[in-house]
Amino acid sequence: MNILIIGNGGREHALAWKVAQSPMAEKVFVAPGNAGTALEEKVENVAISATDVEKLVAFAQANHIGLTIVGPEAPLVIGVVDAFRAAGLKIFGPTKAAAQLEGSKAFTKDFLARHHIPTAEYQNFTEVEPALAYLREKGAPIVVKADGLAAGKGVIVAMTLDEAEAAVKEMLSGNAFGEAGSRVVIEEFLDGEEASFIVMVDGKNVEPMATSQDHKRVGENDTGLNTGGMGAYSPAPVVTPEIHERIMQQVIYPTVNGMAAEGNIYTGFLYAGLMIMPNGQPKVIEFNCRFGDPETQPIMLRLESDLVELCLAACDGKLDQKKSQWCEQASLGIVLAAEGYPGDYRKGDEITGIESAVENQKVFLAGVENKDGKLVTNGGRVVCVTALGDTVYDAQQQALALAEQVKWTGRFYRRDIGYRAVAREKNNA
């Protein structure tokens, strides 16, 4: 069958690469795709924006698309799934109503509270003065979040009260994130270890994907500004089998059942960004209604099952009949970013060494365009170099060796991706 993937990032390159390996996939279209998806066998880019829902539906109808997988959040939040379903097309992702779990942080926090799902203490504000009063009452460190979609950058972890007050003023009166920041969520700072817990949902049944851990801060040792993610590895040893079970029982099932009970049946990838507290209690930091980027890249490297089969089963409400198989090895992905990211960054630099990957390694392209036959930088996060290894340390060393070979002017990356897992491995050795 023909398959359509919506999006243009490193995540979509990884999804297209994995989907193309399925014997069921005749042709894989990516809208709009990037220079990386264009290089894959069986894969073709389509010049349609990820949010041009009408054109996407028309394309799917004209090209006999048997399955569509949505990569990014923006098309989900505007109802791409509703439109495809109305046209009788199979699409894997949540409806517009269900996608509020990512589209509105205030909706999510209120939902978690209603269903007694563990999360940080919080309050929502639309006015500056009450928000500032709450900050002064609670003190720092404290977290300030823009309510709407802000490309992963609308979260300020304020270590001082001054920083928190500045963030509130900037979002509510300074209009830093436009409509997305017209309401803010202020919540307690959770001090634990983060994990990305991604599952597939068919409305009621849940199939967990491999666990992972993302690194949001731009600098080594988790310093500097928040980004969309500078690297990730899988599995995340912080999620022990016992904690895995707690997450399923205390977070995932209550979320899926709670959404269904409120009339928002959830199908699609559900990503719970969790803080695992020192006592092993998982708390929800955020939900995303799609696969994470860069977590998708190392996770797809470990997935041995047919992703198309899993998605089709989920679309048909038969996910309980499938079991995902995973490679025993660890995988790790390092994002190579353009100079200046996450602020204003350089563009248009020629990239070399993309073809350096050997077996058990893969370079996934994100902010890259093909200009007159040359690959040049065209985004903040440019590529994600990923590798498998017997341990997280091995995978890290393989990925670092690959990162050395992919070059352009001003590229930078974190050399410590996976450091928590590596420290655990050393302690357990």
Swiss-Prot record:
Question: Could you say which EC number(s) this protein's record lists?
Answer: 6.3.4.13
Q: Which residues form the ATP-grasp domain?
A: 109-316
What positions does the entry give for Mg(2+) binding?
A: E286, N288
> SMART domains attached here?
GARS_A, GARS_C
Q: Where does ATP bind?
A: 135-196
* Details of cofactor binding: Binds 1 Mg(2+) or Mn(2+) ion per subunit.
Q: Which reaction equation describes what this protein catalyses?
A: 5-phospho-beta-D-ribosylamine + glycine + ATP = N(1)-(5-phospho-beta-D-ribosyl)glycinamide + ADP + phosphate + H(+)
Q: Does the keyword Ligase apply?
A: yes
Does the record's keyword annotation contain Magnesium? yes
Q: Which cofactor does it need?
A: Mg(2+); Mn(2+)
Q: Which UniProt keywords apply?
A: ATP-binding, Ligase, Magnesium, Manganese, Metal-binding, Nucleotide-binding, Purine biosynthesis
Q: Where is this region: Disordered?
A: 209-231
One Pfam assignment: GARS_N
This protein's pathway: Purine metabolism; IMP biosynthesis via de novo pathway; N(1)-(5-phospho-D-ribosyl)glycinamide from 5-phospho-alpha-D-ribose 1-diphosphate: step 2/2
Q: A single Gene Ontology molecular function, please?
A: ATP binding
Q: Which GO terms describe its biological process?
A: 'de novo' IMP biosynthetic process; purine nucleobase biosynthetic process
Q: Which family does it belong to?
A: Belongs to the GARS family.
Report the HAMAP family cross-referenced here: GARS
- PANTHER family assigned to the protein according to its UniProt record, in alphabetical order: PHOSPHORIBOSYLAMINE--GLYCINE LIGASE (PTHR43472), PHOSPHORIBOSYLAMINE--GLYCINE LIGASE, CHLOROPLASTIC (PTHR43472:SF1)
Q: Which NCBIfam families match?
A: purD (TIGR00877)
Q: Report the protein name in the record.
A: Phosphoribosylamine--glycine ligase
Q: Which organism is it from?
A: Pasteurella multocida (strain Pm70)
Encoding gene per record: purD
